Swiss-Prot record:
Domain of life: Eukaryota
Database matches in SMART domains: CYCLIN
Keywords associated with the record: Cyclin
Protein name: Cyclin-I2
SUPFAM superfamilies: Cyclin-like
Positions with biased composition (Low complexity): 64-76, 83-101
Length: 369
């Protein structure tokens, strides 16, 4: 009877051990949320977090009942030949074949759905970026009188030593903020340098962790020694006021990353044509091309999505000459007009040719010791 006294609390613990392995991940429910579909139950993962199982005892009622019946049947004289004991004894081996095939669907289903889920997720990100770009994009023609000065200051920013280890997206957002400013208002040439480094500081405030954002004095020491902290702060307020305190728009790098992922996901054999078959190295190379094109004064009139689309389609034409299917698919998803695309493509090709002999290096080098 001592063992019978311990039986009532055992069904829940045995139920947990039956559905969760000793090394099971406590955050298994997060995968279901990320994938957007419920994962199939398996012996390796619990269907609900521990806190929810205590509130929802009937979630796995059939399994709980069978396990309870099996454990309760053990102390009730199983070898006396009684009919109830024989039935409960048969129920234990009968339940084993039902659980045996469960791991197989779990290992197959996420892999079968993974491609579709990733593509849907990418298209969702693309749509959000396009909507935000359409809402914030003002358009307009760049100032012709600062054409050379603009290219010079952008190339200077790209040559900067990355003293504070800013990310690629931070530098790209800085160029985007600077370009939006020049489209929105006329900026005198003598203020271009100050506006450039201020755009970089604003981009760092948006993208970087708070502990990695340098103080104004440290920032001016490395990037703007000609300006006082007060001058930099006044320029920040001027840019924020002109851009309505809404700095984050879908950057060209955002669109480039999404387009590249869509191509690799929809056309997997493209990976065989990439340098070292490494998508990350390929994106880094395209990012350098993109940033160099953002130094082109005439390209300020195009949206970031259009510029990124042209960069990646030119690369696809180089890798797969004469094969138009991936390019047509991207053009449909990007929702870019034919005239805008053709005009931007011509200017991008000119810009890339003019920068082929340039000694400009990207700004993602570590500072010298």
């Amino acid at each position: 009877m001592a063992s019978g006294a311990q039986l009532p609390p055992q069904p829940s613990s045995s139920e947990v051990s039956a559905v969760q392995s000793p090394g099971g991940r406590p955050g298994a429910g997060l995968e279901e949320t990320a994938l957007g579909v419920p994962l199939p139950p398996s012996p390796g993962e619990a269907p609900l977090p521990r806190s929810n199982r205590s509130r929802c005892p009937g979630t796995r009622q059939p399994g709980a009942a069978s396990l309870h019946a099996a454990s309760a049947a053990v102390p009730v004289r199983p070898r006396r030949g009684t009919a109830p004991a024989g039935k409960t004894a048969d129920a234990v081996p009968a339940a084993a074949p039902e659980q045996a095939p469960r791991p197989a669907p779990q290992s197959r289903k996420p892999r079968n759905l993974e491609g579709d889920l990733d593509e849907r997720r990418l298209l969702c990100h693309l749509q959000l970026a396009q909507d935000r770009e359409a809402r914030l994009w003002r358009g307009g023609k760049p100032q012709d009188e600062i054409c050379d000065a603009f290219e010079e200051v952008v190339l200077w920013l790209l040559r900067l030593q990355n003293t504070f280890y800013f990310s690629q997206s931070t530098f790209n957002l800085a160029l985007t903020i600077f370009g939006r400013l020049l489209i929105s208002v006329k900026v005198k040439e003598k203020y271009l340098h100050c506006a450039t480094i201020t755009s970089l500081r604003l981009a760092a405030k948006v993208n970087e962790e708070e502990e990695f954002i340098p103080q104004v004095k440290d920032f001016t020491k490395h990037y703007g020694s000609d300006y006082s902290p007060n001058e930099l702060l006044r320029m920040e307020l001027a840019i924020l006021d002109r851009l309505h305190w809404d700095l984050y728009i879908g950057t060209p790098l955002d669109f480039l990353t999404i387009f590249h992922a869509l191509v690799v996901l929809s056309w997997p054999h493209v990976l065989e044509l990439l340098p070292q078959r490494n998508p990350s190295l390929h994106v880094a190379s395209l990012t350098r091309q993109l940033q160099h094109c953002m130094a082109g004064h005439q390209l300020l009139q195009f949206k970031g999505s259009t510029l990124a689309l042209v960069i990646i389609t030119l690369e696809l034409e180089r890798l797969m000459p004469g094969w138009c299917a991936p390019i047509s698919d991207l053009l449909k998803k990007a929702q870019v007009g034919d005239m805008q695309y053709s005009c931007c493509k011509e200017l991008v090709m000119q810009q890339l040719r003019s920068l082929q002999s340039s000694s400009c290096t990207d700004n993602f080098v570590s500072p010298a010791n």
